Each structure stands twice: as structure tokens, then as C-alpha cells.
Regions:
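Bacterial Sec-dependent N-terminal signal peptides
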Residues: 1-24
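Intrinsically disordered, low-complexity terminal tails/loops enriched in metal-binding residues
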Residues: 20-160
Length: 160
């Protein structure tokens, strides 16, 4: 009887540790996805189409590594559909057009899945009529870069 209880307790401990490790890996993947999104945004703020393309490729790799149990296949495909054109061109105007859709899909994802424990600021540019996400309250507009760097305002804080 004591051996049975000991075996059950041991199996329960192993199962809990395995589940915790999976949760930790999944949370890391989600955090990486958000970080890669921020990297694309920062490249667009800097007006660097080459860097935005590279960062979009990294975003795609991260998105492709996420288990469909964590984010649905449909959501991942929507993110890939938005990020792929950014990765395939160095033309910053084209990249910024696709970034708007990517931002909308990332905002929806951030509201439904905990991507990070840190606040996520959703900002809005009235000139472009588009949103983006940031890890900083300070406005740095990815749609106009240095031409209108501070155009916009924070409209929502996610994970507050």
C-alpha cells in the first residue's frame, strides 16, 4: 500500500514538473513573438527597411515554432500572412502598409493570450488611422518614422 502511494506521488510530481516545463517553454515562445514584433516596429521607426525585413524573418521563424495548442493555426497563419510581405521587401512604404495589419492581429492576440507579464501599450496614429503595440509609453511612430516620430497617443494598456 505504501509503495503504491509512493509511486502515485512520484508520478504526480513528474507530471507536474513536465507540465510546468511545457508552460514555461510556451510562455517563452509567446514572449519571443512579442519581442520580434517590437523589433520590426523599432526598425520601421528608424526607417530601416533592410532591418525590418530581417526582423520580420525572425518573427516568422518564431511564429512557426509555436504550438497550435497555444495559438490557433488560423491566428498564426494571419500573423504569417502579414509578416511575410515585410520580410520579402526592403521598401519601407510597403512594409509599413503590412505592419498595420500585423499590429491589429498582434493586438487581438495580446488581448486573448498572455504574451508577457509586462504592460503592452497600444498606440494610435490619427494621420495613418492605424494602431501599433509598444513596450514603452513614449510615442515613436513606426508609420512615419522621423517625419512624424511623436504623432499618436496611447489608447489602451494591455496586461495592466
Amino acid at each position: 500500500m505504501k509503495k503504491s502511494i509512493l509511486v502515485i506521488a512520484l508520478l504526480a510530481t513528474v507530471f507536474v514538473q513536465k507540465t510546468f516545463a511545457q508552460d514555461s517553454t510556451q510562455q517563452h515562445q509567446l514572449s519571443q513573438l512579442l519581442t520580434q514584433y517590437y523589433n520590426i516596429k523599432d526598425a520601421l521607426v528608424a526607417g530601416n527597411g533592410n532591418l525590418a525585413s530581417i526582423k520580420a524573418e525572425e518573427f516568422i521563424k518564431t511564429a512557426n515554432s509555436i504550438d497550435y495548442k497555444v495559438i490557433s493555426e488560423g491566428n498564426i497563419n494571419a500573423l504569417l500572412k502579414d509578416a511575410t510581405p515585410i520580410s520579402e521587401t526592403k521598401d519601407i512604404k510597403v512594409q509599413r502598409e503590412h505592419f498595420s495589419n500585423l499590429s491589429n492581429n498582434m493586438a487581438s492576440l495580446a488581448k486573448s493570450v498572455k504574451l508577457t507579464t509586462e504592460p503592452i501599450y497600444q498606440a494610435y496614429c490619427p494621420m495613418k488611422k492605424a494602431n501599433w503595440l509598444s513596450n514603452d509609453k513614449a510615442i515613436k511612430n513606426p508609420y512615419y518614422g522621423s517625419a512624424m516620430l511623436t504623432c499618436g497617443k496611447v489608447v489602451e494598456t494591455i496586461n495592466q
